[in-house]
Curated annotation (Swiss-Prot):
This is ATP synthase protein YMF19. The gene is YMF19. It holds the Pfam family YMF19_C. It comes from Arabidopsis thaliana. It catalyses: ATP + H2O + 4 H(+)(in) = ADP + phosphate + 5 H(+)(out). A stretch of 270 kb of the mitochondrial genome is duplicated within the centromere of chromosome 2 resulting in the duplication of the gene. The expression of this duplicated gene (At2g07707) is demonstrated.
Length: 158
């Protein structure tokens, strides 16, 4: 497209406006066009907002069950990953003993994983909502649940 100058400016502007408004009217007047989609989205959002008020339950037991399931799933994933790391550490340590080299003496071991699991489950049950309606807050979770790395040579977690 050539640069706009005094002679071609008007014709380029005219054709640009003609094509733009033609396509704009064609798209917007179509029932499935842009305006049709926006109408559908507005209606969908209204229906979801009305339905969302009836779906959300204010039953404290259901919320407590959801929190318990979430925490237990997290603990099971953590325990599974710690178990895999522990198995890997044992395999590498056996290879090191066969070669008379300790490859992971400074790497650490995950022998306290069962103690961690007991501690986390105890803290979850301790900070779960009581009959007074107190819910688990981020402050309680931060103070009660901690990830602990057991360095090689330390005892069990107490």
């Amino acid at each position: 497209m050539p640069q706009l100058d005094k002679f071609t400016y008007f014709s380029q502007f005219f054709w640009l406006c003609l094509f733009f408004f033609t396509f704009y009217i064609f798209i917007c007047n179509d029932g499935d066009g842009v305006l049709g989609i926006s109408r559908i989205l507005k209606l969908r959002n209204q229906l979801l907002s009305h339905r969302g008020k009836t779906i959300r339950s204010k039953d404290p037991n259901s919320l407590e069950d959801l929190l318990r399931k979430g925490f237990s799933t997290g603990v099971s994933y953590m325990y599974a990953s710690l178990f895999e790391v522990s198995q890997w550490c044992k395999a590498v340590d056996l290879l090191g003993k066969r070669r008379k080299i300790t490859l992971i003496s400074c790497f650490g071991e995950i022998s306290g994983s069962r103690g961690m699991e007991r501690n986390i489950l105890y803290n979850i049950s301790k900070s779960s909502p009581s009959n007074t309606g107190r819910w688990i807050t981020c402050r309680n979770c931060r103070n009660d649940i901690m990830l602990i790395h057991v360095v090689h040579g330390q005892g069990s977690i107490k």
